[in-house]
């Protein structure tokens, strides 16, 4: 609510980071640090707008701890030229990310993207042909989400 209000009233891009609930003053520094981390991740993964909590980036935090050389190795093993086409096409990547963020819900994704349902299904089929991953299925969606995170971390 607050981010939307500030964006509407001030016309400014607003990004809010939320840390963790603390049991007292001694944990405030940790919570603040986590809020800053959420903001840093939001810039890379969400365009730096909206409200973001530290918890929503737990997988990113875990993958960031893996040495870059291992991530690059994993990415080069998995990604072929066709998969890179999906990652380099902003429209396709946005479609996939929105689909994943709406819990694999076709109707909600098409509404959020102002797109006809059949157009969305066509794009999801195109992603499946390029990657071999049917992101409508949870296991493939998880794999694809991990690939997106690794890809964005490698571009950072």
Model-derived regions: residue spans:
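Cytosolic nucleotide-utilizing catalytic cores of signal-transduction proteins
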Residues: 1-156
């Amino acid at each position: 609510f607050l981010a939307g209000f500030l964006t509407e009233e001030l016309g400014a891009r607003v990004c809010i980071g939320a840390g963790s609930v603390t049991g007292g003053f001694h944990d405030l520094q940790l919570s603040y640090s986590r809020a800053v981390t959420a903001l840093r991740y939001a810039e890379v993964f969400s365009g730096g707008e909206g409200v973001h909590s530290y918890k929503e980036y737990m997988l990113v935090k875990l993958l960031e701890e893996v040495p870059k050389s291992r991530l690059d190795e994993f990415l080069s093993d998995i990604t072929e030229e066709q998969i890179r086409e999906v990652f380099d096409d902003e429209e396709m990547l946005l479609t996939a990310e929105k689909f994943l963020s709406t819990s694999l819900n076709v109707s909600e994704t098409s509404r959020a993207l102002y797109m006809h349902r059949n157009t969305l299904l066509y794009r999801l089929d195109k992603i499946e042909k390029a990657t071999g991953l049917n992101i409508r299925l949870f296991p493939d969606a998880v794999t694809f989400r991990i690939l997106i995170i690794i890809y964005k971390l490698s571009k950072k």
